[in-house]
Regions:
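Polybasic low-complexity intrinsically disordered regions
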Residues: 1-82, 86-88, 95
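Short loop/turn segments at secondary-structure transitions that flank enzyme active sites
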Residues: 18, 43, 107, 160-163
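Generic, well-ordered alpha-helical scaffold segments in large soluble proteins
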Residues: 40, 69-76, 127-130, 134, ...
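Helix-centered, glycine/charged polyanion-binding patches within enzymatic domains
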Residues: 74-150
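A short, flexible helix-boundary coil/loop motif
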Residues: 138-139, 163-183
Length: 183
């Protein structure tokens, strides 16, 4: 990264490492590459599936990445996205016009159902936490920019597989309980 005194090197073994300023008191900086995760906003019985993930090298501004990420999510799911709920970093986004984007903490144009759905936006924070801790998104052992992209995708795939396995385990328990009840 170009600093005041030249290029900064944050890691000898991974020169593509970047410093991401989080602005939090406990952990003000994170080192690595930005990753974008997209989930549904609906409450799901088994948990929220990750629909799209992408590593964003070069520290792009969040608002500039929104249009591309939503377009790729629409292509993957085959469904038109009507509303997007994002965090406060997406001020000045460049999303296409028919799509409505609501930021957390926004007051204008927020009422009724949208207010409920906007409160639901914070549910993705748990998904991000599980991907970082269980899915090894916090530490990447793969090399280069391509390794960053593969790590982000594999973390999301692993998270989705864990949800499916949890659902299959519950289904198997119900089947076994029904078989025991008949005996």
């Amino acid at each position: 990264k170009q600093g005041q005194r030249g290029w900064k090197l944050y890691s000898w073994h991974a020169p593509e490492t970047e410093c991401i300023a989080k602005g939090k008191a406990a952990k003000p900086y994170e080192f690595g590459v930005k990753v974008s995760l997209t989930t549904t906003n609906r409450r799901c019985k088994g948990g929220q599936f990750i629909l799209h993930t992408k590593s964003l090298p070069g520290l792009p501004y969040d608002g500039h990445t929104l249009a591309e990420v939503l377009e790729e999510t629409q292509a993957l799911t085959g469904r038109e996205i009507e509303r997007a709920y994002v965090d406060k970093g997406y001020v000045g986004h460049k999303a296409p016009k028919p799509l409505r984007v609501f930021r957390s903490g926004q007051k204008r144009g927020v009422h009724g159902q949208i207010k409920k759905e906007l409160r639901r936006r914070s549910a993705i924070e748990a998904v991000i936490g599980h991907c970082k801790s269980d899915g090894h998104l916090d530490r990447n052992y793969l090399k280069g920019r391509q390794g960053d992209q593969i790590n982000a995708v594999m973390s999301a795939v692993g998270y989705n597989f864990r949800l499916i396995l949890k659902w299959l385990k519950a289904l198997l328990c119900k089947i076994i309980a029904a078989m025991w009840a008949q005996m």
